[in-house]
Every structure is written in C-alpha cells, then in structure tokens.
C-alpha cells in the first residue's frame, strides 16, 4: 500500500524540480512526507559550450541535482537514462514503463509532472508529462486503483505574466483553472538555495538575479497546480488525498 503522504515528482532535466516544485517538495518533506524524483535525463546538452556538452556536463548536472535534492529533502532520485533533447524521439511505451517502474517502487499517493504545455513547450517536458500521465493510469490499473491516487500538472497562473515579463517563453494557465496552490512562503529561501545549486545553468543565474524583485511582488509565495486526476474543478488545500 502507498504511504498516505508520499509524493513522486517526474521531470525531464536537472533543475526542473527546483524551479517547478522546490518549495512544495521542501514543505512536504519537512512535514514528514516521503518525496521522490524521477528525472528522465542528466541535462547533457544544457549549454552553449560545445566543449562542455555531453557526459562531462551530465556528470556536473547530476551532482547539482543531488545537492539540490539534499537541500529540498527529496529522499530518492532515479535517473531514467534518456538523452537530453531526445526524449521526445524515444520509444513512448518504453518511457511510460520506465516511469511506471519508479512509481511501483515509490508507491506514491500523489504524482506531479508537466502538463501538455510543458510550461516552456520544451519537447522533453511535453514528452515526459505525456508519459508520466500514461504511467499514472497504467500503474493505477495494475495496482487495483490503490495508488497513485492524485495526478497534478505544474502550472503558472496567468496573473504572474506581468511579473515575470517572459513574453512567449513560458506558458500560463488561466487562474480559474488552478486547482491547488501551495503556500511556500516558509520555505522560499530553501527553494532559492536549491535553484542556486544549478550553477551550470544560465536560467538559474538569471532567475536568482531577479529573485529579490519577484519576492517583493509577493508572486513567489505559492506554487500552483492543475489536478489532472481525479478530474473536476474542486479546489485542493493539499496535494495529498484525504
């Protein structure tokens, strides 16, 4: 049986966990929940420096991810062994089964991943979100619907567009479609420390350069989600089933 408070995060690259759900992971881990992560790649191509790309960068980013997860309290990290920027080209059923295998081990009560827009429309994000959704339903059927019980997609509410001034780089969700908002104000600094672990990434450096401005706006105190299962418009006060 699943733990009543266990959370599995399923993402594509090192740093997705810190940007997307770092506060939620830290908050729940500190409260005693078991938080696990499945990461499809090691981010081997996340650089403009050809001398760094490949296994060397993958090793660097794996270390960054493990340090970030230690800060957040993520108890277990599983790398799925896919190549950065090629996940969308991989055999889909193989990806689904790789994620399903982690779900069977972790036995989570709730799963968080990317929605259809991948937040940034990155093909790896979209592929991982689709596969995680398929794996969620596959494992539920195989396990007699005992677990996992809830599926959430990371979402950026439309109201934050004016704060982040990201143009078309990020995909936003109408505020009324948000079904869960986790208050991370108590662990916001923990989230920022985790993001800072990803030193090799320009996105992390840029985010931290604007962090004080965004903190002052009050728009960084919540992480938001759309509940993909069970469907419905009910608002959740927690990601865990009652």
List each language-model region with its residue ranges.
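Active-site rim/loop-helix segments in enzyme catalytic domains that contact anionic ligands
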Residues: 1-106, 133-134, 138-142, 226, ...
């Amino acid at each position: 049986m699943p733990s009543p408070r266990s959370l599995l995060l399923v993402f594509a690259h090192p740093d997705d966990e810190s940007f997307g759900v770092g506060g939620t992971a830290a908050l729940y881990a500190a409260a005693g929940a078991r938080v696990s992560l499945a990461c499809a790649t090691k981010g081997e191509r996340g650089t403009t420096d050809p001398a760094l790309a490949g296994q060397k960068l993958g090793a660097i980013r794996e270390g960054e991810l493990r340090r970030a997860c230690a800060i957040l309290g993520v108890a277990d990290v599983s790398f799925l062994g896919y190549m950065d920027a090629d996940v969308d080209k991989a055999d889909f059923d193989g990806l689904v089964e790789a994620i399903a295998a982690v779900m069977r081990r972790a036995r989570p009560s709730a799963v968080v991943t990317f929605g259809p827009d991948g937040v940034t429309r990155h093909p790896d994000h979209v592929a991982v979100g689709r596969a995680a959704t398929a794996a969620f339903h596959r494992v539920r059927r195989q396990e007699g619907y005992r677990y996992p019980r809830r599926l959430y997609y990371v979402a950026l509410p439309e109201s934050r567009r004016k704060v982040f001034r990201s143009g078309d780089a990020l995909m936003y969700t109408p505020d009324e479609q948000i079904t869960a908002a986790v208050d991370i104000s108590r662990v916001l600094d923990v989230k920022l420390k985790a993001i800072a672990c990803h030193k090799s990434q320009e996105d992390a450096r840029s985010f931290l350069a604007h962090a004080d401005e965004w903190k002052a706006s009050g728009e960084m105190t919540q992480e938001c989600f759309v509940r993909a299962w069970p469907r419905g418009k009910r608002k959740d006060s927690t990601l865990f089933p009652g």
